[in-house]
Amino acid sequence: MTTLAIDIGGTKLAAALIDKNLRISQRRELPTPASKTPDALREALKALVEPLRAEARQVAIASTGIIQEGMLLALNPHNLGGLLHFPLVQTLETIAGLPTLAVNDAQAAAWAEYHALPDDIRDMVFITVSTGVGGGVVCDCKLLTGKGGLAGHLGHTLADPHGPVCGCGRVGCVEAIASGRGMAAAARDDLAGCDAKTLFIRAGEGHQQARHLVSQSAQVIARMIADVKATTDCQCVVIGGSVGLAEGYLEQVRAFLMQEPAPYHVALSAARYRHDAGLLGAALLAQGDTL
């Protein structure tokens, strides 16, 4: 069965046809509407989906935010702008005329990455470090989503009780410090206004403050992984996202994790599917692959 998979992110929308063997074809991208209004997103999704829907039998959506009864919600409402409570599933069912499933993008990516691991792995955690910090947990071969869709939102665990206020309302969340947005917000002096990509470039050039911001992010993620290991006893952790996959970042996370006591050590690896993980994971779930 061919699935029309859609990935809704903060900066871009992606769609592709995915067959039962996870082969991707006709991948398309559009920028996420800057206005973040329901009408703008509806029109963008229509333009994205229209050329593909005739060849699909179902729709699978991986989206930023929390998916609750087909509705788009968020711990950090600022991430969604005017899209809070957007009827995501109903909208796609109307546009495509096909049965539709929706899941959080990090949860979907976790499911895809889990399927790329050896068969003896039953417990794993996926962490994406990008504009924000998200995650997905697979326990005993089952993806944990939670009744309210909240499971795996690891970026909103505590990193520093005296840290910056997070958009979710808590103080010192991992996301507020370690994410690309958090790093950029902490940049000062000649780095003020720089995005995460620029900070990594400047860090590579030896800029002291940029190196500190990248290192601080990696250390916060490593400590979070130690907490995750203690909570889930996972066999491995897979790291993805634009920050997580940046050159040299995983090595720093690994080095900081090794400074933690031995019981908290866990195998780390880079995401295999990279920017297609959400599409593939959503397609797997829509195809009924819930083990």
From Swiss-Prot:
Keywords, sorted A to Z: ATP-binding, Carbohydrate metabolism, Kinase, Metal-binding, Nucleotide-binding, Transferase, Zinc
Principal EC category: transferase
Protein purpose: Catalyzes the phosphorylation of N-acetylmannosamine (ManNAc) to ManNAc-6-P.
Pathway(s) the chain acts in: Amino-sugar metabolism; N-acetylneuraminate degradation; D-fructose 6-phosphate from N-acetylneuraminate: step 2/5
Family: Belongs to the ROK (NagC/XylR) family. NanK subfamily.
Annotated positions binding Zn(2+): H156, C166, C168, C173
Molecular function, one GO term: N-acylmannosamine kinase activity
Presence of the UniProt keyword NAD in the record: no
Catalytic activity: an N-acyl-D-mannosamine + ATP = an N-acyl-D-mannosamine 6-phosphate + ADP + H(+)
Binding positions (ATP): 5-12, 132-139
Organism listed in the record: Salmonella gallinarum (strain 287/91 / NCTC 13346)
Entry protein name: N-acetylmannosamine kinase
Subunit structure: Homodimer.
